[in-house]
Regions:
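Phosphate-interaction motifs
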Residues: 2-189, 351-354, 417
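Flexible glycine/proline-rich
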Residues: 62, 285-435
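Phosphate-binding glycine-rich loops and their immediate beta-loop-alpha structural context
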Residues: 154-270, 274-275, 442-470, 476, ...
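N-terminal hydrophobic or amphipathic helices and topogenic motifs
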Residues: 398-473, 482, 523, 632-644
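Ligand-binding cleft/hinge of the Venus flytrap
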Residues: 456-461, 538-563
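Periplasmic-binding protein-like
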Residues: 505-507, 597-632, 636, 642-644
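Flexible hinge/capping segments at coil-to-helix
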Residues: 512-533
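Ligand-binding clefts/hinges and TM-proximal coupling segments of bilobed small-molecule sensing domains
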Residues: 527, 531-552, 628-644
Length: 644
């Protein structure tokens, strides 16, 4: 058995405080001028209208780590003592179309983080759990898989981060670097410029495309989030930002990009190409072109961080995932920029809050946990020593993974968890460091079904937060006391407990190509056929209704092609029909008509707003009641909707 790839591994991780000190010692000379830079003049502005996602993010099933793509069923029973051997039939990197790299039974394809999942594969095994076997030519011919995986494990499905048609940002939002990153992911443009030291920002990765340009999802292209969000954060810290064109992962191209940018900058920030994968080569380029001071920080997110020098220019290599990049910048880089710019440290604001849901961690690295706030009191808080019943913020985790652009836009602050801590229990007091002193909890927090009617209600409120994570999530988190209101569709097996504030009916069924072709007139037409079907994910009220319909009709879901692959957003299945990737998709009449598709009706489903019984006198609930009194007016423009 012979290793065939030259992967650099993380060995001695730097303490976060030592990493901050190393960055503070970099030669960052002050530069006071302020100028406008394309794309970034929206930071600090107030959003005037709602922004809906026009695309799925990501637009393809994406590998979440370096390893091998395979069929999960082939790994059944695999472990360290009894590995499963698979034939290697290809290699696939980020930014490449799968081509002939297709996975069949007993086969695997080597895949880099962020690459498109090859056809036939439904899971990823990390490289750390693989033994590569070389042929006589030195190329990998087979792999021994030392762990079993489940379908979808280590895979980020298309639309898992943000689904087309979902409400991304609401009117009245102050655009911070978090929101700028989200807008960049959606293809929007612009932010204001103000800074002092000259800071260069360079993204790496062949898969990155500037916002505003079309994406080729078949090649795994995504909008360049980091260039926009990191540049915005550097300006906010006081830097004059110089943006550079995206560089490929090729070592020589990276070296040329660094050589070209460094002389004009006091500090050069890159994102991506810093981890231990074979394609990620910045650490080697930095060693050859300058001085590598450290590689790897005991921080999560943020482990694959680089610090070094390129001549007289300081250098920091940020991780490629947007959340990781922004966390490292905020924690380690921004203080050094502010010091060089002569700016005082910003006023820090923190609050003591009660954690509503448990949080579990792997010990060994300091954890930065994004959290949201709900301003309320609780019986537990009063019993714990607050006899006056003063308002105490409640907090809940919003971490959706380092690759999810929305994690920070949904958050109000961070909880720093010590490296030795592995569990924080519900009800524990935690310190939340707010993203700014101006942060306030939303006027109303709603969690539940992704529904156009609920979105219309939220738009009529001042500063709400609506997390369209599905009926099951809304019910579960309402039981934990997280939202003010749960959006519940249908009759979930475990119903929400609380008063019904408002309700409406929505017409649901199948979205089909325009003209309602005769080959899909009912759900029965899909059973046993080879017609591809686009479904919603489990946890959606619509998905539960369709499951019940099939059960009542005696139809095995396994006989419907694609039934088990769930999409996240309520418009996602219909959009698959629109692009020709599905013959039918589960959805709403409102969606089908908006996209000029045909529609096969199945009936109506009731959607309810269920209030948190412990927050009946909250100000947001009173405002919501006033809005729901106008429910017929709010729903009038949504086809297939009627107030109950």
């Amino acid at each position: 058995m012979a290793p065939v790839s030259d992967r650099k591994t993380f060995r001695d991780l730097a303490d976060p405080d030592a990493a901050a000190a190393a960055i503070a010692d970099l030669p960052i000379a002050p530069e006071p001028p302020v100028e406008a830079v394309p794309l970034d003049d929206a930071a600090g502005r107030i959003l005037a209208e709602r922004i809906d996602a026009g695309i799925d993010v990501p637009g393809f099933d994406r590998a979440s780590l370096d390893g091998y793509a395979l069929r999960a069923g082939d790994t059944a029973g695999a472990d360290e003592a009894d590995p499963v051997r698979l034939e290697v039939v290809g290699t696939l990197h980020a930014g490449e179309a799968p081509g002939a790299a297709e996975v069949d039974d007993g086969e695997a394809v080597e895949v880099s983080t962020g690459a498109v999942m090859p056809p036939g594969a439904d899971a990823m095994v990390p490289i750390e759990r693989i033994d590569e076997i070389a042929s006589e030519s030195g190329a990998v011919s087979d792999v021994d898989v030392r762990t079993a995986v489940a379908p979808r494990e280590n895979v980020m499905p298309a639309g898992a981060d943000l689904a087309a048609g979902q409400r991304a940002l609401g009117p009245g939002t102050r655009l911070t670097p978090r929101e700028v990153g989200l807008l960049a992911a959606l293809g929007e443009e612009s932010v204001p410029v103000r800074a002092r030291p000259t800071v260069g920002v360079l993204s790496t990765g062949a898969e990155l495309v500037p916002p505003g340009e079309p994406l080729d999802h078949d090649s795994g292209q995504i909008h360049d989030v980091n260039a926009a969000s990191i540049a915005a954060a550097a300006r906010e810290a006081g830097a004059d930002v110089q943006r550079y064109s995206t560089a490929d992962d090729d070592p020589e191209a990276l070296a040329e990009s660094l050589r070209s940018a460094a002389p004009a900058c006091d500090l050069l920030l890159t994102s991506g190409s810093t981890s231990a994968g074979a394609v990620d080569a910045l650490h080697s380029v930095l060693e050859a072109e300058g001085e590598l001071l450290l590689h790897g920080v005991a921080l999560k997110p943020g482990k694959p961080t680089l610090v070094g020098r390129l001549g007289d220019c300081g250098y920091v290599g940020l991780p490629g995932y947007p959340v990781s990049a922004m966390m490292v910048f905020r924690t380690l880089v921004a203080p050094a920029i502010r010091e060089a710019a002569g700016r005082p440290e910003p006023e820090r604001a923190s609050v003591e809050a009660e954690l509503l849901e448990e949080a579990r961690f792997e010990p060994g690295r300091r954890r930065l946990l994004p959290v949201g706030l709900v301003e309320a009191w609780s019986d537990a808080t009063t019993a714990a020593g607050d006899p006056d019943g003063d308002r105490t913020p409640l907090t809940y985790p919003v971490d959706r993974g380092s690759g999810a652009t929305t994690s920070l836009s949904r958050a109000d602050g961070l909880v720093t968890v010590p490296a030795e801590t592995s569990y924080v229990a519900p009800g524990e007091r935690v310190t939340v460091e707010l993203f700014s002193p101006a942060v306030r909890p939303p006027s109303l927090l709603a969690i539940g079904e992704d529904d156009p009617g609920a979105a219309a209600v939220m738009d009529a409120l001042d500063r709400p937060r609506y997390l369209p994570d599905g009926t099951a999530a809304g019910v579960r988190r309402l039981r934990a006391g997280v939202p003010d209101v749960a959006v519940v569709a249908g009759e979930p097996r475990r119903d929400a407990e609380g008063p019904e504030i408002a309700a409406w009916e929505r017409e649901w069924g199948l979205a089909v190509p325009a003209g309602t072709p005769e080959d899909v007139a009912t759900i029965e037409d899909l059973a046993g056929s080879d017609l591809p079907f686009a479904n919603l994910a489990s946890g959606s009220g619509l998905r539960a209704a369709l499951d019940d319909r099939l059960d009542a009709a005696g139809i095995d879901p396994a006989t419907i092609e694609g039934y088990g692959v769930g999409l996240r957003g309520h418009e996602s299945p219909a959009r698959r029909v629109l692009t020709g990737d599905a013959a039918a998709g589960l959805g709403l009449r409102a969606t089908a008509e908006r996209l000029d598709l045909g529609f096969v009706p199945f009936g109506t489903q009731r959607v309810r707003l269920i209030g948190n019984p412990d927050r009946s006198d909250a100000a947001g609930r009173s405002a919501l009641q006033g809005v729901t009194d106008r429910l017929p007016e709010l729903l009038a423009s949504i086809s297939g909707y009627e107030a109950a």
